[in-house]
Structure formats: C-alpha cells, structure tokens
Amino acid sequence: LNYLAGPANRQGRIVADNILGAKIPYEGSIGTSIAKVFDMTVASTGLPGKRLRLEGIDYMSSTIHPASHAGYYPDAMPMSIKITFDKQTGRLYGGQIVGYDGVDKRIDELALVIKHQGTVYDLMKVEQAYAPPFSSAKDPVAIAGYVAEDMITGKTNPVYWRELRDIEMENKFLLDVRTQDEFALGSLPGAVNIPLDELRDRMSELPKDRMIYTFCAVGLRGYLAYRILTQHGFDKVRNLSGGLKTYRAATAPIVIHQENEDQTDESPSPQEKTLSSEPSAAPAIPVAAAKTIRVDACGLQCPGPILKMKKTMDGLASGERVEITATDPGFPRDAAAWCS
C-alpha cells in the first residue's frame, strides 16, 4: 500500500490530539494514490486482484472503458476502470483507473466508498454534478457498479483475458459481434464474425455443444449478445470482460526501442530500404501535386477514427492522400495495424 502525504498528515494530527489527552485511534489507510505519466494519469485505491489472490480472498473484477465525459461533447477522452469486489456481498475491495481526463475525481469516488466499507451497489447510486463537458448521464463509476451488479446477480457470466488466452482453441467458439468493418480491422485468431444486429437471424450457425465466448470492442455488445443467446436456450456462453480492448492491451508484446550507435543519420531506415528495393513500385507523386483529403475525427472514440479513415480511403482516387486528425490516443496504433 502507498502511505503518502494524506495519511501522514492525519497521523500527525492524531498524534497531537493524543498528546493533549484525546483518545483517537488511527483507522488505517486504503492506499489511495495517483501519478502523472507524461500525458496520462494512473490511479489506484484499495486492494488489487494480485493482493487479493495472495491473501486468499475470493473476489470478482469488472473492467470497463468509458469516456471522461459525454461522447457527443468535444474532447471526450477514453479511460479504463477496473474494480475488485466480493462475489457474494458486493463489497468493494479496490479500483484502478488509467486515463487522460477525469481520473482523479473517479478514483476519489471509489476511495470514499471503500473507506466506508461500501459495495458496488453504492457505486450505482453515485450522484455527481452532471453536464456534458464534465461527465455523462451515467457516470463511469456508476457504470462500473452496474457491470459488477450484473456479474453478481448472474445477468452475465464473464470470462477474463487470462482464462480465454489459456483455453485451447478446439474447446472454444469465439464469437465477435462487432460490425463487419470493425472485424476487418482485426480480431482474435479463429473468431467468427456475426454482427450483433444479425445475431437473432443467424443462431443456426452457432454450436450448442461448445462454450461460446462472446466479445466486442469494450464489452457492451458482447453482454447484449450473451443475453440474447441465453434467452434462446444457449447455456454454454460467457462474455469477455472488458472486450477486445482489454485482451489486446493485456497480451500485446512489450517493445523496447534501442538506439543503434553504429547507424548514422545518413543511413536509410528499414522502410526506405524496402521502398527503394521495389522494382515494380509506381513512381511517387510529388506531395505538392497530390490532392489532400483532410478528415476531422476529433472527439470520436475507438473504432470511430479508424472506420472514418477506412471509409475515406475507400473513396480515394489515384494520387490523392489523406490527412486525418484524431484525439483518440489509440488511433496511431490502430492505423498502423490496419495499414499492415
């Protein structure tokens, strides 16, 4: 746990009060902390899953990827929230948040509930100041509570990324319920794409003798697919907690870039070597002569920017180029993956 300035100052006051005759105990700390990492904010409070496993405490967790405020208002930024809680009572054990905006006030809300031994049901009742520039009608903390309540009450049966990764392919049926355009940008190996809007008409394509793992981008459509399937007699269904975004982030290889001291500034990059070695490559069109199509994708959340880029690219004429502006932090990675 992180005993930082806040607990230290409380301890100082308690010491002074007790010196003067008061009998005030120190109630302990739940280790709430926050840090700035370049333009991102990382925060934690309470007990994470790793500590709960070490203590032998049975728990569940939920992961969501909401926006910092209403998505239709400019400059909404993504954040990821994970909470841990008791399987039976719903008591909130801990929470971790990573994002760009609004992380501080959300971690404070979680810390307050944990400090007062509250539950995920208390998160559902959170009442905060709301206007589109500051939050959404359902605050991210409340959404975390709703998802946790769905798990406790059996409205969904989650599968976590570690479990899904370790299950042999022949023992699972991966159902990607995103749109065809999203699926074309990449999915889990072996996944079958049936968009959510088509699911009711294509249930005959699904096996009833194998476990079906539904997933989407962040979890919501996967949950809806889970509900549809279970209400139509499928009893072997689980939904990927946090969706494809969580799975990809957790399983992505860590790349360490190192400077090559022997390489001079004049040495061509690998990309330059590849391009120059292509004998059949068409002659490059001068940048000044190429028509530039400018696309504004600011404010859109994943997969909005990449789908907008794809739609623009599909309509390009020969020699035209695209210049796209986006605020979604994951867009450069998504664009590189799509181009490859």
Can you describe what each PLM-predicted range is?
Residues 118-132, 136-173, 180-213, 217-291:
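Rhodanese-like catalytic fold shared by cysteine-dependent sulfurtransferases
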Residues 101-120:
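A short, polar/charged loop-to-alpha-helix boundary motif
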Residues 275-340:
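Domain-level signature for proteins that mediate thiol-based redox and metal-cofactor handling
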Residues 83, 110-111, 164, 212, ...:
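Generic hydrophobic alpha-helical segments
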Residues 52, 229-230, 340:
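Hydrophobic alpha-helical packing residues
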Residues 91, 207-211, 315-322:
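Short, surface-exposed connector motifs at secondary-structure boundaries
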Residues 1-101, 132-136, 140-166, 172:
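Mid-to-C-terminal Rossmann-like scaffold of FAD/NAD(P)H-dependent oxidoreductases
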Residues 100-101, 135, 219, 300-303, ...:
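Short, surface-exposed acidic/glycine-rich loop or hinge patches that mediate macromolecular interfaces
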